[in-house]
Swiss-Prot record:
UniProt-annotated location(s): Plastid, Chloroplast
UniProt entry keywords in alphabetical sequence: ATP-binding, Chloroplast, Nucleotide-binding, Plastid
Positions with a binding annotation for ATP: G72, S73, P74, G75, T76, G77, K78, T79
SMART domains associated with the record: AAA
Origin superkingdom: Eukaryota
Name the UniProt record assigns to this protein: Protein CfxQ homolog
Name of the encoding gene: cfxQ
């Protein structure tokens, strides 16, 4: 059946029907900064929506490549964005369930001959109809170890990425330099990953905002002086090894809460007000080892 060139579809109506803006608004609300990442997600959502409308009018085109690569440091929102991406894919009908399964090498690779295939296939079975997020994916490939079984897991993933791409989306994640090397060593994998999104590190000011949000969610607050101390802490921590962006800020806040509790406990019989219980004072942060160096 031919369709007239005058046949119309309503882009805005379909966009609203699928409630894509709702997911994008959640992304804006849940993640501070990351403007380049949010822009890429919106671009992908637009492509998927237009492709869906083309299909409604019988226009021929291959399904857009949906497998993705998220690169960046720990704590930059990769898992959160993967969750939102799974939701978008579900709302637009590209996956059946829209759930996210997060795994690492240990979930896929066995320790002896014959162990890897069943492990990998079991994970894939759970992920079908949704999105499989493989964190630190480069650990799957260990070229220096001939007895490593990671290559077997990669081969199974390759087959599924090609043969069942209409029922599963795979997102590979990790540090950018290591992921680049991983793709160079596995060209078959690289050719099947169409969307590469780089997650920048947060600025100190963005991390301060994130820290304040984390505290507000737990009904704590910072004084003006405490805000300045936390900002100083973040700037110092960023220069230290194993800095993990929002995760490092969360750890700092957890320790500050513990110091606050001990400070009040050690004060003896003092009657505490609600303000005492919710306020993180500068001293609760200044006792960090970073300020003693």
């Amino acid at each position: 059946m031919s369709i007239s060139n005058e046949t119309t579809v309503n882009l805005q109506e379909e966009y609203e029907k699928r409630q894509i803006q709702e997911v994008l608004d959640e992304l804006d609300r849940d993640l501070v900064g990351l403007i380049p990442v949010k822009t890429r997600i919106k671009e992908i959502a637009a492509l998927l929506l237009v492709h869906r409308l083309r299909k409604l009018l019988g226009l021929t085109s291959a399904n857009p490549g949906l497998h993705m690569s998220f690169t960046g440091s720990p704590g930059t929102g990769k898992t959160t964005v993967a969750l939102k991406m799974a939701d978008i894919l579900f709302r637009l009908g590209y996956v059946r369930k829209g759930h996210l399964i997060t795994v690492t090498r240990d979930d896929l690779v066995g320790q002896y001959i014959g162990h890897t295939a069943p492990k990998t296939k079991e994970v894939l079975k759970r992920a079908m109809g949704g999105v499989l997020f493989i964190d630190e994916a480069y650990y799957l490939y260990k070229p220096d170890n001939e007895r490593d079984y990671g290559a077997e897991a990669i081969e199974i993933l390759l087959q599924v990425m090609e043969n069942q791409r209409d029922d599963l989306v795979i997102i590979f994640a990790g540090y950018k330099d290591r992921m680049d090397s991983f793709y160079e060593s596995n060209p078959g994998l690289s050719s099947r990953v169409a969307n590469h999104i780089d997650f920048p590190d947060y600025t100190p000011e963005e991390l301060l905002i994130i820290g304040k949000i984390m505290l507000e969610e737990q009904q704590y607050r910072l004084t003006k002086e405490s805000e300045l101390v936390l900002l100083d802490y973040i700037k110092l921590r960023m220069k230290e090894p194993h800095f993990a962006n929002a995760r490092s800020v969360r750890n700092a806040i957890d320790r500050a809460r513990m110091r606050q509790a001990n400070r009040m406990f050690n004060a003896g019989d003092k009657v505490l007000t609600k303000s005492d219980l919710v306020t993180i004072q500068p001293e609760d942060l200044l006792k960090s080892r970073l300020f003693k160096k």
